[in-house]
Amino acid sequence: MATVPTRSGSPRQLTTKQTGDAWEAQARRWLEGKGLRFIAANVNEPGGEIDLIMREGRTTVFIEVRYRRSALYGGAAASVTRSKQHKLLQTARLWLARHNGSFDTVDCRFDVVAFTGNEVEWIKDAFNDHS
């Protein structure tokens, strides 16, 4: 778990949520630097959450952000399991429906931004509804 200095100078532990939020914010800034445009963050639908939704040109990009301290056990990218992919697909399907769209009518893809230690890996089109 990450630490953050406090006013007293002694570090305090960040919660898992705070750590996740910090990495998601870093991913957003990094992707904006690559030309993507922010739409939404922490989108909740029954059964799941999407970390970031952004646009690249005409493509809606659903982004899962992962962080691991080290590559032990496969690193951050390996932690996006088939079960997690299914939840992301379902959540995106519901979000699109709420915005009058579907996988058939909206050009979209699923990316993973994986932070392992100090390394960042952007996996475009990491999976899809046909995987």
Swiss-Prot record:
Classification via InterPro entries: Restrct_endonuc-II-like, tRNA_endonuc-like_dom_sf, UPF0102_YraN-like
Matching Pfam families: UPF0102 (PF02021)
Biased segments, Polar residues type: 1-19
Entry superkingdom: Bacteria
Region (Disordered) residue spans: 1-21
Molecular function GO terms recorded: nucleic acid binding
Family: Belongs to the UPF0102 family.
Protein name, per record: UPF0102 protein YraN
